[in-house]
Amino acid sequence: MQITDEQAKAMTSAGLNLIAQALTIYDSDLKLVVSNAPFQQMFNLPDRLVTPGAPFEDTIHHLATRGEYGPVEDVDSFVTERTDQARAFIPHYMERTRANGRTISVEGSPLPQGGWVSVYTDI
């Protein structure tokens, strides 16, 4: 059976949107490559932040200004710090309590070709 690239993309998107966990993939320049619908829903993100090419730092800035990371005195410094951490491309796992009181786990792993894949789970 042969499928077109467009069909493969549609099938992959359907599969990613079916899972309950939120997922993002950023390239080596920290630009969004792909995210699933649960990512946008979990964080109530505007479309501009889940469109391929959206900068990682814009998403962090948006979340920080909404209190997603707790009280942040200097949002710009916080965004710079988080972006620098992401650029280190070191695997990580953390659990944090969100502004809505729910706890999520965040697991990130660098990709061999550069970039990140992150999975967010409501625990």
Where are these regions (language model features)?
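Short, charged amphipathic alpha-helical "coupling" segments at sensory-output junctions
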Residues: 1-14
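Primarily the dimerization/phosphotransfer
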Residues: 17
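Catalytic micro-motifs at enzyme active sites that drive phosphoryl/nucleotidyl and oxygen chemistry
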Residues: 12, 106-107
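Per-ARNT-Sim (PAS) sensory domains and their PAS-associated C-terminal
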Residues: 83-105, 112-114
